[in-house]
A protein has these predicted regions:
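Active-site-proximal beta-alpha core segment in soluble small-molecule metabolic enzymes
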Residues: 5, 9-13, 17-19, 29-191, ...
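Anionic-ligand-binding alpha/beta catalytic cores of soluble enzymes and soluble regulatory domains
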Residues: 178-261
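Alpha-helical scaffold segments that flank or form the walls of functional sites
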Residues: 21-23
Length: 261
């Protein structure tokens, strides 16, 4: 590959390497189901260019951050495969219920308020509505905090009309295998899951997959490792490189003191 004359640089994205990274992660996840996180336009590499390769490699669940990203990807995913689950991590913003349901996009419910809104919507429509439920096990960013989980335990009717297709939680320090936070989050998650109906559990981001089978549960949820970033920073990178930056050398100059640059 060369830099075209009209450009001073080119970023090359190797889609075959992304597909190979999906297979490497799936093998590390002991061949259980692995979703693909393609938020932020596929970590800046172009979600629409990447998604078909991931579907061909076997991905059947996708995660984005925002509903707008999901609305853009839904028709493409439908053309790739008839049964792709598409989740929005940022959750159910007020008034978006119809957009989610009519486009077969699944909200990740992050609070009791979102659970209440989705349950009410299901009852209004008269049909059960699928969704993921996000438990915060220590990341302290999004998801139900422990007190909300305990309120759900005491009031399972709050989930009426909701079909949980996935219960997810996010590791805060998985790239540090010796960090005690990992085991703390795992122990809390196991305890919190007893407050919820049974559903496939998704706990592992890229680095989490390499913490071993105790952390795996049912569905892997890697992002950055698909794109070649090392999920095990203390060890050699098991991923294939995906991105190559070529830049044109504009000029080479020979200079010497007292010249300055
Ligand atoms: C970004 C994100 C992921 C993917 O994490 P990586 O570290 O990029 O593998 C998984 N789950 C959630 C909730 C995220 O926000």
């Amino acid at each position: 590959a060369a830099v075209p004359a009209s450009a001073s640089g080119v970023l090359l994205v190797d889609r075959a390497a992304i597909a190979e990274n999906y297979r490497i992660l799936k093998a590390a996840f002991l061949e259980k189901a692995v979703a693909a996180v393609v938020k932020a336009d596929g970590y800046g590499l172009g979600a629409e260019q990447i998604v078909p390769s991931l579907v061909r490699a076997g991905a059947r669940s996708f995660f984005v951050a925002q509903l707008d990203e999901a609305l853009k990807l839904r028709p493409l995913l439908d053309r790739c495969h008839p049964a792709i689950a598409l989740y929005v991590l940022n959750g159910l913003t007020p008034g978006t219920e119809t957009l989610f349901a009519d486009n077969t996009i699944l909200p990740v419910l992050n609070s009791l308020g979102e659970i209440e809104a989705w349950s009410r919507f299901a009852q209004q429509r008269g049909t059960a509505q699928p969704a993921a439920i996000h438990l915060d096990s220590g990341m302290c960013r999004l998801g139900l905090p422990p007190d909300a989980v305990e309120r759900l335990r005491g009031n399972p009717g709050a989930l009426d009309g909701i079909v949980p297709t996935c219960i997810l939680s996010h590791l805060a320090c998985a790239e540090e295998p010796d960090n005690p936070k990992n085991a703390e989050q795992l122990a809390y998650l196991k305890q919190a899951l007893t407050a919820l109906p049974r559903a496939p559990v998704s706990f592992c981001n890229s680095s989490g997959i390499f913490l071993g089978r105790d952390y795996h549960f049912d569905l892997g949820r890697p992002g950055v490792a698909l794109y070649g970033v090392n999920p095990t920073p203390a060890a050699p990178n098991p991923m294939r490189p995906v991105v190559r930056l070529l830049a044109r050398i504009l000029q080479i100059r020979a200079i010497d003191a007292p010249q300055t640059v």
